[in-house]
Amino acid sequence: MAGCCCLSAEEKESQRISAEIERQLRRDKKDARRELKLLLLGTGESGKSTFIKQMRIIHGSGYSDEDRKGFTKLVYQNIFTAMQAMIRAMDTLRIQYMCEQNKENAQIIREVEVDKVTALSRDQVAAIKQLWLDPGIQECYDRRREYQLSDSAKYYLTDIERIAMPSFVPTQQDVLRVRVPTTGIIEYPFDLENIIFRMVDVGGQRSERRKWIHCFESVTSIIFLVALSEYDQVLAECDNENRMEESKALFRTIITYPWFLNSSVILFLNKKDLLEEKIMYSHLISYFPEYTGPKQDVKAARDFILKLYQDQNPDKEKVIYSHFTCATDTENIRFVFAAVKDTILQLNLREFNLV
């Protein structure tokens, strides 16, 4: 140590800089450890993008008036997409319009180029209103499992009066319900208790899944979303394949990937509100003959579907943390994510020097 006294000013400065660099590297390493990567997975329309929007509302800056205005044309486009889907299904399902005038109204809506829509004309609004009130369209809506229709169709169409007003600015709920298929990878980082949660949302449609592999490094937790209401629906990409069977097979593939051996798995059984509605008229046993519970029983249906997914786990040592959710309900997601955050931190105590 005596030699230190003989160091030149230049050497002392060099040592100081080296020590500072060492300290910074240690800090950087610690900071890197204080980031959690949560990968949102699930088939198309399971609610992943809605969940990301909720994180922005609950843990981020939310949606300002200006942000919400930016969703206006998407709301309009969602309305036309839904009405056009029902008009096409009227032909396919051979349902008659009760009101003769609605054949003309259907033609008005049919001619709209959805991706070019930026406003609603008076004629279009009148046509949409009359069509939605037609008993034929209502029958077509009730048979929506036989074709592809967005979950938000009824929400927007029953509120067309408000949406058609010139002063219309989408509400937070309107924003949550906008359907835009995710293509590519969306990352949303937010800070919670000095830890960065980096949430990664990838497209759920089959064509998007090949991109997932780029996200598989250093994943702390998988959050896999299941749409409970899809037990009686077919895939958009393949109309003779049950959506829940596809989701179940995907879940099994994901949890057995070698990349995720050390990642915790959290299962969100989403759209519980839609299941409660649907189970009253669409019986689970018609699609899953192994179901032995009573008809029109929400709890029995939920428990059966949860077990379907739990049974995909071949590693009985690995715990699957499950929650029933409604991604469009901010309070429900606030409550559920608080529990998820605690679970994730609990599982990563040592890494974050919390013990």
Curated annotation (Swiss-Prot):
Cross-referenced PANTHER family: GTP-BINDING PROTEIN ALPHA SUBUNIT, GUANINE NUCLEOTIDE-BINDING PROTEIN SUBUNIT ALPHA-14
Protein name from the UniProt record: Guanine nucleotide-binding protein subunit alpha-14
Lineage: Eukaryota, Metazoa, Chordata, Craniata, Vertebrata
GO BP of this protein: G protein-coupled receptor signaling pathway
Known partners and oligomeric status: G proteins are composed of 3 units; alpha, beta and gamma. The alpha chain contains the guanine nucleotide binding site.
Region (G4 motif): 266-273
Region (G5 motif): 325-330
Record CDD domains: G-alpha (cd00066)
UniProt-listed PROSITE patterns: G_ALPHA (PS51882)
Gene3D superfamilies for the chain: GI Alpha 1, domain 2-like, P-loop containing nucleotide triphosphate hydrolases
Gene Ontology molecular function: G protein-coupled receptor binding; G-protein beta/gamma-subunit complex binding; GTP binding; GTPase activity; metal ion binding
Chain sites annotated for binding GTP: 42-49, 176-182, 201-205, 270-273, 327
G3 motif, as annotated region: 197-206
GO cellular component: heterotrimeric G-protein complex
Segments of this protein annotated with the region G1 motif: 37-50
Disulfide links within the chain: none
Residues where Mg(2+) binds: S49, T182
Top-level division of the source organism's lineage: Eukaryota
InterPro entries linked to this entry: Gprotein_alpha_Q (IPR000654), Gprotein_alpha_su (IPR001019), GproteinA_insert (IPR011025), P-loop_NTPase (IPR027417)
Function: Guanine nucleotide-binding proteins (G proteins) are involved as modulators or transducers in various transmembrane signaling systems.
Annotated organism of origin: Mus musculus (Mouse)
Entry's family note: Belongs to the G-alpha family. G(q) subfamily.
Keywords: GTP-binding, Magnesium, Metal-binding, Nucleotide-binding, Transducer
